[in-house]
Amino acid sequence: MTTTPLPPWPDATLAALTTDALHQAARERVEHAWQRCREVYPELPCPGVWFDLRGASAGQAHLGRGGLRFNPVLLDENRCAFFDEVIPHEMAHWLVFHLADGTRLKPHGREWKTVMQDLFGLPPKVTHRFNVARAQPAPYRYRCGCRDYQLTPRRHALVVKGRRYRCRHCAETLVYCAG
């Protein structure tokens, strides 16, 4: 079994790619990771690849949809990390899903960690440290007695429907600051 990371994608090449070219390069990287996984599990189906994930998640292996979803904003802002870490991370999930009892295994359990370490030669990190400000905008300003808060469109919509949020420090209900 191969225990080295996938070959690095040249940084300068990644930095110069347009969005469409970047997505195509990411699909190629998924193909390389899939070929690596097939060394140990030849029956592994090739995953579909979509760039429709939003919010703070960088990637998602989606068994029901039959493939991998990636956050296009985080991909654009963290190109090297995506190619070196995120794509192998999600492909490790894809492989574990397809093993016997894969759907019953913990997402970041022993099997996933083994794939990350022994197949991709990477530390089994569960979370990323990307700046998610552009990927997860919070344009709605709220205020309590002690500070301001930025709420996401989803939380703001819940407030409009009647949900209330309280400050964890002063316990006052947050109030929308229009404008």
Positions of predicted regions on the chain:
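Active-site recognition of the HExxH zinc-binding catalytic motif
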Residues: 85-98
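Metalloprotease/metallohydrolase-associated module, dominated by Zn2+-dependent proteases
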Residues: 2-81, 98-179
